[in-house]
Amino acid sequence: MGRDEDAGSALEAAIRELLATRAAAATICPSEAARKVALERGSAEEDAWRSLMEPARMAARRLVDRGEVEVLQRGLVVDPSTAMGPVRIRRAR
């Protein structure tokens, strides 16, 4: 498994774990998953999580495709492949 695939799997797991610790209707920001994975990897750089932001959004898209989560903007469910700007992630309803 390559580093990108490894990061993708880790980010998917982080999204699931973060949502599992929140209320059923709660949302998370993709940056929370990126920060979690960067921390778990022991990155010494304070902003190492930033390079994981697009992979985190891609991980969320894969989870949407599997029916596990929904991506929202301004409180509305959106297509993550066309969403521009800040998004939130919640468990699928």
Predicted regions mapped to residue ranges:
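Long, charged, low-complexity intrinsically disordered regions
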Residues: 2-8, 93
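Positively charged, polyanion-binding regions of nucleic-acid-associated proteins
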Residues: 6-27, 31
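Short, cationic-aromatic polyanion-contact patches
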Residues: 75-93
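Short, positively charged loop/turn segments that connect secondary-structure elements
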Residues: 37-58
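Auxiliary Fe-S-binding modules of radical SAM enzymes
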Residues: 54-59, 72, 91
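A short, conserved structural fragment
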Residues: 67-73
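Basic amphipathic alpha-helical segments that dock to polyanions
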Residues: 62-63
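The alpha-helix within a helix-turn-helix
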Residues: 34
